[in-house]
């Protein structure tokens, strides 16, 4: 047996780790769909000025990436994007949403949207915290 360390995103064998984990999850939870979800904000020239990327997995919306162009922040676009993503996830049977943010990012925004802190990692990066948040629909 040998252990290898790679400093690249998708070395040969990386997909085997994902497939193995998926097989384990299915064995423990039954077959649950993994539904990719992308919501985009475009201008009249079709340029993307914001959006959300994530997935509906294990009955929850997982928000992986959320961005709104600096010039458009504070105008309600982020709230509209998040609302659309949450509604799309509900259509696929999601019971809530979860995400991570940082103290230098959008913690206050998410709290206004009804998200609550469920965990915190201090000093990631030093001087800032990484925050896990969730919102259960009901």
Where do the protein language model's features map onto the residues?
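Acidic/histidine-enriched, beta-strand-rich ligand/metal-binding domains
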Residues: 72-73, 96, 109
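Conserved active-site tyrosine of GNAT-family acetyltransferases
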Residues: 17, 110, 115
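Conserved GNAT acetyl-CoA-binding A-motif
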Residues: 89-102
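Acetyl-CoA-dependent GNAT
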Residues: 3-64, 69, 104, 119, ...
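Conserved catalytic-core motifs of GNAT/GCN5-like acyltransferases
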Residues: 98-100, 116-132
């Amino acid at each position: 047996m040998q252990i290898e360390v790679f400093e690249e995103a998708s070395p040969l064998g990386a997909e085997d780790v994902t497939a193995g984990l998926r097989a384990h999850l299915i064995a423990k939870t039954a077959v649950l769909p993994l539904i990719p979800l992308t919501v985009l904000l475009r201008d009249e020239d079709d340029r993307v000025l914001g959006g959300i990327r994530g997935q509906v997995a294990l009955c929850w919306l997982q928000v992986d990436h959320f961005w709104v162009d600096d010039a458009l922040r504070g105008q309600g676009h982020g709230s509209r994007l998040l609302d659309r993503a949450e509604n799309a996830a509900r259509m696929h049977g999601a019971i809530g949403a979860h995400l991570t943010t940082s103290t230098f990012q959008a913690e206050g925004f998410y709290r206004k949207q009804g998200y609550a802190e469920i965990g915190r990692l201090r000093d990631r990066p030093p001087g800032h915290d990484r925050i896990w948040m969730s919102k259960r629909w009901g």
